[in-house]
């Protein structure tokens, strides 16, 4: 019988809801760090010139601190196992124009979820 080996390494997640940045722009940044170690992801984000880098850096630091505090995992052993960006609600505003008209402005938001696991497996 073929049985799948289950992954028993502990994992931790952190999420950020309703970030006022387009999910297209945020997804471009998150795709660069998926699968990286904690330290490498922070280094990559530090040198990228995008506005989404700062909240993603804070979210990764929060997930690593959660893993350290709640599960006792060391930050140097963590890697990003899951990183996803979903489309949030669109905030609608109106821009006044000439002769009583109004143009609609759509301000997109996104939801970011970061999952981290330890490289060391628990048997």
From Swiss-Prot:
This protein binds specifically to 23S rRNA. The globular domain of the protein is located near the polypeptide exit tunnel on the outside of the subunit, while an extended beta-hairpin is found that lines the wall of the exit tunnel in the center of the 70S ribosome. HAMAP family: Ribosomal_uL22_B. This is Large ribosomal subunit protein uL22c. InterPro entries: Ribosomal_uL22, Ribosomal_uL22_bac/chlpt-type, Ribosomal_uL22_bac/org-type, Ribosomal_uL22_CS, Ribosomal_uL22_sf. It holds the Pfam family Ribosomal_L22. Belongs to the universal ribosomal protein uL22 family. The keyword RNA-binding applies. SUPFAM superfamilies: Ribosomal protein L22. Part of the 50S ribosomal subunit. One of its GO terms (biological process) is translation. Its main location: plastid. Disulfide bonds: none annotated. It is found in: Plastid, Chloroplast. Keywords: Chloroplast, Plastid, Ribonucleoprotein, Ribosomal protein, RNA-binding, rRNA-binding. One of its GO terms (molecular function) is structural constituent of ribosome. Signal peptide: none annotated. Gene3D superfamilies: Ribosomal protein L22/L17. One of its GO terms (cellular component) is chloroplast.
């Amino acid at each position: 019988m073929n049985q799948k080996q289950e992954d028993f390494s502990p994992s931790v997640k952190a999420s950020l809801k309703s970030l006022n940045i387009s999910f297209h722009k945020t997804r471009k940044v998150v795709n660069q760090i998926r699968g990286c170690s904690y330290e490498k992801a922070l280094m990559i984000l530090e040198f990228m010139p995008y506005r989404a880098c700062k909240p993603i850096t804070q979210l990764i630091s929060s997930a690593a601190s959660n893993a350290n505090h709640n599960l006792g995992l060391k930050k140097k052993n963590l890697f990003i196992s899951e990183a996803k960006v979903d489309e949030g609600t669109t905030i609608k505003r109106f821009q006044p124009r000439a002769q009583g008209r109004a143009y609609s402005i759509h301000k997109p938001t996104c939801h970011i979820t970061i999952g981290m696991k330890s490289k060391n497996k628990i048997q």
